[in-house]
Amino acid sequence: MSAGIEYIVKRTNRLHTAGVAILIVAVAISCTGCTDKPDWRVTDDGILEYNKPAPGSDYRLRTLEETDNYTLCEVTYESRGAVIEGLIRMPKTAAGKGKSVPGVVLLPGATVTKEGEQGLARYLEGIGYASITIDQRNLGGIDMEADLEMFLSGVEPIEHRMVYDALFAAEVLRKQPNVDPDRIAYLGESNGGRFAIIAYALDSDALGVVAISTCGYGIDAAVAAGRIRDPEAIRFYRSIDPDTYLSSIRPHHRPGKFVMIHSLNDPIIGYENAQATYIAAGWRKSLHTIETEGHGYSAEMNPFLESELAEIFS
């Protein structure tokens, strides 16, 4: 059993008794027609659904750096009760040539800031791609127990809102004049990779996702083993598990690709866990490995990133 499943099972058991009482309250709220967000839904099968974000003038840009090779802008936007800050890095390869470049929504791992992710963003800029990197809520940290309590009481969990933040970031990137809105992909590291996978599954216009040093939670395996029994807890945990979405891409989703890159000697997320998630994917996919011990992006992954993004955007 993976560490992710163990974490979830322990908290589900702790909350089971309280959850029944909370669920009764949630049903009462639902019957009165009161919901936290009318465009936030979780299906009976545990699939998260959002209406597509439509940013107008409700985001702000401020130029931080401008060189012969790139422009770096700070972006700020409001998303479901929070102010999200990000950085847009734009290569100048297309400037003044009437061309547009593909764009990547870049989601860092837990505790990593948008500034701390700029090494990867600079690499993407160097091979011709724009990127938007956001400071995720709680800097990507999650509290599953608190989110489950919110869900059982009919309140939109933070982890769901973090997916929406990524979807909003994609729409902001699509609005940039030098970005091709039809060529957008998601790229995430560690916990950011989980959100990247789910956001890609919900974004029917995106072309692919690259997940570095990440894995799903294996919720269905825990349910099958009888370790999680409460139906509403199952529905919530499936909604935050990337594995749930790997075989359920909506029929109208554009042809895309699922890419994983992982160290065989990752000390945080074992390769076997990443492999289990990769096997669960039912669509065009690739898995690349490096041997260097470490967790997250490293320059050793660059050849895989370059070739896979070129294929995704071709």
Predicted regions and their residues:
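A catalytic-pocket lid/entrance helix-loop region that shapes and gates access to the active site
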Residues: 153-155, 214-242
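Secretory targeting signatures
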Residues: 1-37
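C-terminal catalytic histidine-bearing segment of alpha/beta-hydrolase fold enzymes
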Residues: 275-314
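Cap/lid segment of the alpha/beta-hydrolase catalytic domain
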Residues: 111-164, 221-227
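Primarily recognizes the serine-hydrolase "nucleophile elbow" in alpha/beta-hydrolase
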Residues: 167-228
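The feature captures the conserved acid-bearing segment of alpha/beta-hydrolase catalytic domains
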Residues: 231-280
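Short beta-strand element of the alpha/beta-hydrolase
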Residues: 98-109
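N-terminal cap/lid segment of alpha/beta-hydrolase-fold proteins
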Residues: 53-98
